């Protein structure tokens, strides 16, 4: 804004009366006598003194009278506060058109549409402005006589130094000038000011703050320490549902962000599924919730859909507004009671929903100890030549069988008789269904059925029913009332989504019932949910093997359904372990969490670098899409400083598009970085521990925590390091093994591709995870064996030389059964 320039005119100045000029008027005494005494104060000191000449004045007479000066001073403004940056207002130009163009044909003034023009005006091909005319227009528009009438005239005022050729451009002409100005001012006054955190380290990953990636933000904590935004987000994700904040590794205090806007931002990312591990360009479409291979529309194209966590369903809207959305990790929240709402009407479902909790009676609940007739593991003691006691564990080989093999009974009948018996049992099943369920023979052939719960909103569940899938319909059948609750044509299914580990979400084409939830018992077989998902998605499927028709035999044992089928319960409940079945094929390999350790300090230079890159590429080729890889590099830190330091990246899957860039930037440093191989190995293990703790957010859920085989692979350019006689190395080794549950192995880099390929294949066969032994009444020692495959044997030394008991406890997680097994075995005495 600028002060308008007025046309020069004669200035009339008022001159106060003078005593010499107006002697006939009243003297000054009368003038002063009429004023208040508070206006003028007498100054006796000056009255007594005669004004001396300049030559005889002493220096002391120039001392000012402070009291007199302060009494005559006005209000003093506050001094400027220069502690904060001063942002002057933008120099916006007030725009208006010419005076002539401001009047219409009727003589009326046109109204000014906007007092400030922040849009870029086209100044090309405009003649130079006449300065005299512009000044005249400004003086007219701002004059007192025309202020009210001409204040809205649209005048275009151009600066005289504006270049007509268009090379010059004013910043305030940008349409985003006000937005960017507000953002810049906020940035100067906020926590995200462009600071330089020199010498500070992240309180989580202990990397220097200067080692951040492009676009990384820094979080200042209440404990006066700093951390990377993504590092804090990963730990915050693990503790959010517990109502806790991370603890600072430096001072041990609870670390909360100083900026109050950071916590709501992180909570928003967690609730929308955009956590720390989803940021950046590493998003892999194959790892999303929806299986894109089978989530096609009926036209064969990929449908455009809203992420499940952001869907607004009709059941979420009530007279109270929106309900709390049910998230994929909703089992972390308390159940909230809402007003009972009726289940949506026909044509599919015609019964009111009940809210009975999904709970089996005591005799129906699965007990791992009772369910396993014989242990899959064999344990025994032995002694070495030095009289040291060893304990050995071996898991039995897996017995493979085809789909007909599970039908074999004790008489071992031939395949022809098996086929005949299967046809007979299938016929009885069809007769039972036709008599009790499909009386009009409209549903088609039977595919499978199980005892499941269903819901239309994911909150209120209907129990005591069978979900039966036919070739034409999905039928909801109440086996207590022996009546059909609802039927859904198979061509009405649009998408089938894995909502969480226990729930399937079926999106329908109907506007009456847009979706339906199917809930599985948490103790059911691992393959039950993928099997139902596969069968619902493949509309052309018409039959399954007899052993796959029903899986929830335990839940249906108290109902007369199994007996009416005419088949022995143990035969019907026998589940095939054939990995060729479609819903088992993708889950045959154990997912891995693999940490690969690389030493960049070597004398061979570029030759050694090529060997390292070749080994890493071989590992990437051998990993599956659901495996997670982390790389630890020693010889420099995260900012590139060469020294006895280490840095890491991960855990990320093999399809991350940043692996190529990361590997291309690896450079070999001088060979004298570490004193010896033990120091190098110690730094390697310490960096691995930092990576393991940073990626621990993946282990928050039990299904995920026990679903990975964890392995640390140290690629040595020379001999393998011995840690038995170094206590510091052994302590770091035990921390990774017992606390973070990682197995550690050292291998020399070889040019043979088969070596690494075979190593990864062995890791993918680890079925029994987190195997742990305890010796009750003998010692409090706990022996950790790690992950084991079927047929694998491991032996460990125990400290107790004379065990006092023949009993030993073994605990492990069976990946195939998705159950944690805890057993007490009797071991033969030595």
UniProtKB/Swiss-Prot annotation:
Zinc finger (RING-type): 202-252
Post-translational modification, as annotated: Thought to be phosphorylated by MAP kinase FUS3. Thought to enhance the binding of FAR1 to G1-specific cyclin-dependent kinase (CDK) complexes.
Single annotated GO MF: cyclin-dependent protein serine/threonine kinase inhibitor activity
Keyword Metal-binding: yes
Consequence of gene loss (knockout): Some mutants appear to be defective in mating because they are unable to locate the mating partner.
Keyword annotations: Cell cycle, Cell division, Metal-binding, Phosphoprotein, Protein kinase inhibitor, Zinc, Zinc-finger
Record's note on what induces expression: By alpha-factor in a cells.
Biased composition (Basic and acidic residues): 8-27
Phenotype for residue 306 to A: Abolishes G1 arrest function
Superkingdom, natural source: Eukaryota
Leftover remarks: Present with 238 molecules/cell in log phase SD medium.
The protein's assembly and partners: Associates with the CDC28-CLN complex.
Cited function: Inhibitor of the cyclin-dependent kinase CDC28. Necessary for cell cycle arrest. Involved in pheromone response. Contributes to mating efficiency. Required for oriented polarization of yeast cells in response to mating pheromones.
Protein name (Swiss-Prot/TrEMBL): Cyclin-dependent kinase inhibitor FAR1
């Amino acid at each position: 804004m600028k002060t308008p320039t007025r046309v020069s005119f004669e200035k009339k100045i008022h001159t106060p009366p003078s005593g010499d000029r107006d002697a006939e008027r009243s003297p000054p005494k009368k003038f002063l006598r009429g004023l208040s005494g508070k206006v003028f104060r007498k100054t006796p000191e000056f009255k007594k003194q005669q004004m001396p000449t300049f030559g005889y004045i002493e220096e002391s007479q120039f001392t000012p009278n402070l009291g007199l000066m302060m009494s005559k001073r006005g209000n003093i403004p506050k001094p400027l506060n220069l502690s904060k940056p001063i942002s002057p207002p933008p120099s916006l130009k007030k725009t208006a058109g010419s005076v002539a163009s401001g009047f219409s044909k009727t003589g009326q003034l046109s109204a000014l549409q906007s007092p400030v023009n922040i849009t870029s005006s086209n100044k090309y091909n405009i003649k130079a402005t006449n300065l005299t005319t512009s000044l005249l227009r400004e003086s007219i528009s701002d004059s007192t006589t025309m202020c009210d009438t001409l204040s809205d005239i649209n005048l275009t005022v151009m600066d005289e130094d504006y270049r007509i050729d268009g090379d010059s451009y004013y910043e305030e002409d940008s349409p985003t000038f006000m937005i960017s100005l507000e953002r810049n001012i906020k940035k100067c006054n906020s926590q995200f000011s462009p600071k330089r955190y020199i010498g500070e380290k992240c309180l989580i990953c202990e990397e220097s703050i200067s080692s951040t990636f492009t676009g990384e933000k820094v979080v200042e904590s209440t404990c006066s320490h700093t951390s990377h935004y993504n590092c804090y987000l990963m730990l915050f994700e693990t503790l959010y549902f517990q109502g806790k904040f991370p603890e600072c590794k430096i001072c041990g205090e609870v670390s909360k962000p100083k900026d109050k806007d950071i916590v709501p931002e992180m909570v928003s990312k967690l609730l929308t599924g955009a956590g720390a591990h989803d940021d950046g360009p590493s998003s892999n479409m194959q790892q999303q919730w929806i299986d894109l291979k089978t989530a096609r529309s009926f036209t064969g194209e990929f449908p455009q859909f809203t992420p499940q966590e952001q869907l607004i369903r009709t059941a979420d809207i009530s007279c109270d507004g929106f309900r709390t959305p049910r998230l994929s990790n909703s089992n972390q929240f308390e159940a909230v009671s809402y007003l009972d709402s009726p289940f949506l009407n026909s044509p599919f479902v015609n019964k009111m929903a009940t809210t009975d909790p999904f709970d089996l009676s005591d005799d129906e609940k699965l007990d791992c100890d009772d369910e396993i007739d014989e242990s899959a593991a064999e344990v025994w003691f032995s002694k070495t030549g030095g009289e040291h006691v060893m304990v050995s564990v071996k898991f039995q080989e897996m017995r493979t069988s085809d789909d007909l093999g599970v039908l074999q009974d004790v008489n071992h009948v031939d395949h022809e008789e098996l086929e005949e018996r299967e046809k007979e049992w299938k016929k009885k099943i069809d007769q039972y269904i036709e008599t009790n369920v499909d009386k009009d023979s409209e549903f088609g052939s039977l595919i499978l059925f199980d005892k499941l719960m269903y819901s239309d909103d994911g909150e209120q569940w209907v129990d005591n029913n069978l979900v039966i899938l036919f070739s034409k319909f999905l039928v909801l059948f109440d086996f207590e009332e022996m009546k059909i609750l609802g039927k859904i044509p198979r061509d009405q299914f649009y998408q089938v989504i894995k909502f969480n580990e226990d729930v399937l979400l079926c999106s329908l084409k109907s506007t009456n019932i847009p979706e339906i939830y199917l809930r599985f018992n948490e103790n059911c077989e691992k393959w039950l949910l993928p099997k139902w998902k596969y069968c619902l998605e493949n509309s052309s499927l018409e039959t399954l093997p007899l052993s796959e028709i029903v899986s929830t035999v335990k839940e249906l044992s108290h109902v007369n359904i199994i007996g009416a089928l005419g088949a022995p319960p143990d035969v019907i409940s026998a589940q095939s372990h054939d990995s060729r079945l479609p819903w088992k094929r993708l889950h045959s390999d154990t997912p891995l969490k693999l940490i690969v350790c690389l030493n960049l300090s070597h004398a061979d230079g570029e030759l050694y670098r090529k060997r390292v890159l070749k080994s890493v590429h071989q590992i990437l080729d051998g990993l599956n899409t659901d495996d997670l890889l982390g790389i630890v590099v020693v010889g420099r830190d995260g900012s590139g400083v060469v020294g006895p330091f280490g840095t890491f990246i991960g855990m990320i899957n093999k399809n991350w598009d940043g692996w190529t860039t990361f590997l291309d930037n690896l450079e070999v440093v001088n060979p004298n970085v570490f004193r010896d191989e033990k120091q190098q190995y110690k730094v390697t293990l310490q960096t691995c521990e930092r990576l393991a703790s940073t990626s621990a957010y993946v282990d928050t859920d039990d299904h995920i925590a026990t679903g990975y085989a964890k392995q640390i692979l140290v690629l040595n350019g020379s001999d393998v390091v011995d840690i038995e006689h170094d206590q510091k190395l052994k302590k770091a080794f035990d921390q990774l093994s017992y606390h973070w549950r990682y197995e550690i192995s050292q291998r020399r880099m070889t040019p043979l591709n088969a070596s690494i390929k075979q190593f990864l294949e062995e890791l993918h066969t680890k079925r029994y995870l987190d195997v742990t032994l305890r010796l009750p009444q003998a010692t409090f020692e706990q022996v950790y064996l790690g992950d084991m495959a079927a047929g694998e044997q491991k032996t460990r030394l125990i400290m107790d030389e004379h065990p006092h008991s023949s009993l030993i406890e073994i605990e492990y997680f069976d990946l195939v059964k998705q159950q944690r097994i805890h057993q007490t075995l009797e071991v033969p005495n030595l």
